[in-house]
Every structure is written in C-alpha cells, then in structure tokens.
Amino acid sequence: MSVGEGPDTKPTARGQPAAVGRVVVLSGPSAVGKSTVVRCLRERIPNLHFSVSATTRAPRPGEVDGVDYHFIDPTRFQQLIDQGELLEWAEIHGGLHRSGTLAQPVRAAAATGVPVLIEVDLAGARAIKKTMPEAVTVFLAPPSWQDLQARLIGRGTETADVIQRRLDTARIELAAQGDFDKVVVNRRLESACAELVSLLVGTAPGSP
C-alpha cells in the first residue's frame, strides 16, 4: 500500500485489520514556514496528535507542561534514554539542557489509528527513522535559496550574525533533503498543507 492510499492496517486478535495511524516527521530549515504549516495541519485534522517534546529546562513564563513541553528533571530524562523511551534526543546549548521525543505517546496514538506529526531538526528526523522505520520523513523546502534568505531577513527578529549562522545551517539541511522520504516545497501554504494532509490521512479533507 502506498502512502497516499489510506491508513495502514495491522491484524487484530480476531484477524480483522485495524487502522494504524501514520507517523509523519517534519523537518526543514529555519524560516521555511514549519510553524505555519503545523498550525494549518492542526486546523485541518482535528484528531491529529502533535508530538510535544520533553525537555530538562525550566518552564518559561506562560509555558504549560504537556502543552508547550513535557518538563522533566535531568535524572528522569536519563532514565528515559537508558530505557529506550525516546525516539530521539539531543543536548541543547552545549549540554545546558536536553530535549527529545517521547516514544510512548507517539506509539500509543498511532496504535489507535490517530495520525501523528512530529516536528524535529535534521538529526532528530534521522534518529526517528532509525528507531521507527515506519515513520515517513518529510523535508519542507523553500521555493529557492533566495526566497529563504528573504524570509530570514524579513522576519527582523535576528541579528546579522544569527541570520548568517542560520543560513549556514540551512545549506547543510538543504543538501540532506535527499535523505528524506518526501520533499514538500512550501511555495504556497495551502498546497504544502494539502500535501501533508494527504500523507497523514490519505486525502485532503473536502477533496473528491
């Protein structure tokens, strides 16, 4: 069965197929529009399970545990690593804290037929593909290098040094897009969102 044909299935105890939710791992360079695409997907797919990352850092003002992040103490985080309960994890800011993707909520949602979306960086996507081969990795790409530069500069939220670092990282990420199962070019939000909806649930809501 191809990715666009509908939910995958697995045999139940009585031999009848049960739907298994698709797991899509989304990655892409800074300023390519990942957050906007994620918002669109959450609006289009009401039952979408969007993976909330676990982190060892302290909550910032206004952040809600379980909504923005799962805030976990360093000892517990290490236990999750040792027990293989993270699909991927990384040290942030030179080891100042750690963050990662909890395996249990993702597998539990998929097992009940719910589509799952995970947004991570390039290294995270590669790690998840190794630990969860059935996941579909998607690289969200800009229409052109010039477009990505314009988006980064146009945000007006970073210094010139930060923008240059992000562009240097983006070159590395763009060079690796061939490692992904699918590349979606974010020319127009509606089109990019529709492609991802199709990957997650088989067809875009409202389409014939």
UniProtKB/Swiss-Prot annotation:
Q: What does the protein in this record do?
A: Essential for recycling GMP and indirectly, cGMP.
User: What is this protein identified as?
Assistant: Guanylate kinase
Q: Which Pfam families match?
A: Guanylate_kin
One of the record's GO molecular function terms: GMP binding
**The reaction(s) this protein catalyses:** GMP + ATP = GDP + ADP
Matches recorded under Gene3D superfamilies: Guanylate Kinase phosphate binding domain, P-loop containing nucleotide triphosphate hydrolases
Q: Which InterPro entries match?
A: GK/Ca_channel_bsu, Guanylate_kin-like_dom, Guanylate_kinase, Guanylate_kinase_CS, P-loop_NTPase
Indicate the principal place this protein occupies in or around the cell. Answer: cytoplasm
Key words, A-Z: Acetylation, ATP-binding, Cytoplasm, Kinase, Nucleotide-binding, Transferase
User: Per the UniProt record, which EC number(s) apply here?
Assistant: 2.7.4.8
Where is ATP bound in this sequence?
A: G28, P29, S30, A31, V32, G33, K34, S35
Q: Which residues form the Guanylate kinase-like domain?
A: 21-201
